[in-house]
């Protein structure tokens, strides 16, 4: 049985917040690529991504 896709937030070894997007099959499809200094900032990055992706062009 598949799980729902999700954003996984975590603190890395340097103490920075990061995110991963996990697909329904459990595989990581994307990650933040950079660390954030607070939970608020990582949440803001996730919300920006969720808002912008529907209008993203395939190039």
Each predicted region: which residue ranges?
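Short N-terminal "domain-start" leader segments
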Residues: 1-18, 22, 29-32, 47-57
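A cross-kingdom feature marking solvent-exposed beta-strand/loop segments within repeated
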Residues: 28-44
């Amino acid at each position: 049985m598949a799980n729902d896709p999700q954003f996984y937030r975590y603190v890395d070894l340097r103490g920075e917040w990061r995110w991963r997007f996990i697909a329904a099959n459990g595989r990581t499809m994307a990650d933040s690529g950079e660390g954030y200094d607070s939970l608020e900032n990582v949440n803001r990055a996730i919300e920006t991504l969720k808002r912008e992706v529907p209008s993203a062009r395939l190039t």
